[in-house]
């Protein structure tokens, strides 16, 4: 039994297995009752590890648990029964961030490696999806190569945001535009696939369609 003491750090050594477990308790932020617990395993014995959570008092609430990014793990580590939702990385869950899923534009399917929403407190994330599968881009040396992943989708989304800001700045009487307004403009023009309910945890409000967003904006 490991007691909850905010701000405390506990180390536990399993004598025979020589495995050390470090448990650290934190508050996510001030004026918020959400708690953050770090559990670190050192020299973990191979096998199945089970973590039991027991409330200190009769109350209600949800528990979420995540593994570090795959690049930060050693060996094969995974949950036996995992949930693919609420799996995007920070700062994607921020209130003022623009969160982009990535999908295969040829097959119209979200990539299995794309993080999913919603947030812990049910904010709608991702905002929309952008192409991120086999995206051709410039690399050092004057060459072009294909890239796959959220970084490719983010680059496309950032370019789209820049074009929207440029277009607005050139309109008569333009007063500038905020990042939240740019996000809303993109969301307004998102493309929806038939038979899918939007918003959802994979696509957000749909796929980015910059031409449609600007066309709608032009008609307002």
What are the functions of these language-model segments?
Residues 57-102:
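C-terminal edge strands of extracellular/lumenal beta-sandwich accessory domains
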Residues 1, 133-198:
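Hydrolase catalytic cores
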Residues 18, 103-155, 191:
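Catalytic-core environment of secreted peptidases
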Residues 1-16:
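Polar, glycine-rich mid-to-C-terminal structural blocks
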Residues 16-56, 63-69:
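Beta-sandwich interaction modules
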Residues 195-220:
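C-terminal domain-closing interface element
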Residues 38-42, 78-92, 111-114, 209:
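N-terminal domain-start motif of subtilase-like serine proteases
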Residues 1, 86-99, 113-129, 148, ...:
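Mature extracellular/periplasmic domains of secretome proteins
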């Amino acid at each position: 039994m490991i007691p909850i003491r905010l701000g405390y750090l506990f180390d536990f050594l399993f004598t025979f297995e020589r495995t050390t477990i470090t448990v650290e308790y934190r508050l996510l932020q001030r004026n918020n009752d959400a708690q953050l617990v770090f559990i670190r395993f050192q020299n973990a014995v191979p096998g199945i590890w089970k973590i039991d959570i027991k409330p200190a008092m009769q109350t209600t609430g949800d528990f979420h648990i995540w593994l570090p990014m795959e690049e930060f793990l050693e060996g094969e580590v995974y949950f036996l029964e995992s949930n693919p939702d609420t799996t995007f990385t920070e700062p994607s869950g921020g209130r003022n961030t623009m969160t982009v899923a990535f999908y295969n534009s040829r097959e119209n399917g979200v990539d299995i490696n794309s993080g999913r929403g919603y947030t812990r407190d049910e904010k709608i994330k991702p905002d929309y999806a952008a192409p991120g599968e086999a995206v051709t881009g410039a690399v050092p040396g004057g060459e072009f190569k294909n890239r796959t992943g959220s970084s490719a989708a983010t680059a496309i989304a950032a370019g789209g945001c820049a074009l929207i800001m440029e277009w607005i700045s050139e309109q008569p009487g333009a007063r500038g535009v905020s990042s939240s307004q740019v996000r809303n403009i993109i969301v307004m023009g998102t493309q929806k696939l038939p038979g899918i309910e939007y918003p959802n945890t994979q696509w957000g409000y749909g796929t980015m369609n910059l031409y449609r967003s600007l066309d709608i904006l032009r008609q307002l």
